């Protein structure tokens, strides 16, 4: 009887720790959180990597995940507006909204001002029936903060602080994890800076205005972004406009994303005569681990480097 009681209590203890999980809205935030939760508790990700945080619709199972998580980490309604109503119903102490972190807000606000001051007003618009258009960097706040090593470190600090409050018995391990995250990030940032030095003057266009923090952190030469339908081959008018911009600015590469169909990429490649690379903003191929975030940054750096060095 005594042995059974001890076993039951042990099982209950395991269940309690397992339930103290961190749920992040998107995978890149999971990369950051996993570094802090390693050996402490579990990190889970809400959105599938095939989904976009800009237009996702919550399922009933997603609502249950939000309710059962001990800590929910999201950027905020500036990026994931679909989450706002559901998160508003959760206790405030179990929600970490990164938009509200003062240091992160400062980074975002400073970037918005810098983009506004240096915005190129000489850009083209293409108003065909597909609503495809070409633009420089927009004036809205950029909440793709996981591309900022500085903002990501601040996010890690906040996750560590919240987790320590919930699991004080794990304080030492959480602090150890945070220190390791910072050291790994600093080392990786230095490596990427060296790696991209050779391509920092080569211009390129993307199809998603999401990479600004990474571009500024590592000195890349973005010429702007094109907005097109990723599943329908662009029309002649759009292709001509893209070609004109590429020629005018001597762009070396166009960067598509995983949701672009082969037909669209093939059309762009044949019509523009430049290399078409691919960037993965949500790190679909990177597995959650304690070193996942530096691996994610390295994957993005490699994607830039591979296209721009050819």
From Swiss-Prot:
Binding site for Zn(2+): 54, 144, 208, 280
Gene3D superfamilies the UniProt entry points to: Nitrogenase molybdenum iron protein domain (3.40.50.1980)
Chain residue ranges for the region called Disordered: 114-136
CC per GO annotation: periplasmic space
Cell location: Periplasm
One Pfam family named in its UniProt record: ZnuA
Disulfide bonds: 253-307
Statement: the UniProt record of this protein carries the keyword Transcription regulation: no
Domain of life: Bacteria
Record keywords, A-Z: Disulfide bond, Ion transport, Metal-binding, Periplasm, Signal, Transport, Zinc, Zinc transport
GO MF term list: metal ion binding
Stated role: Part of the ATP-binding cassette (ABC) transport system ZnuABC involved in zinc import. Binds zinc with high affinity and specificity and delivers it to the membrane permease for translocation into the cytoplasm.
Family that this chain belongs to: Belongs to the bacterial solute-binding protein 9 family.
Protein name (database record): High-affinity zinc uptake system protein ZnuA
Gene that this polypeptide is encoded by: znuA
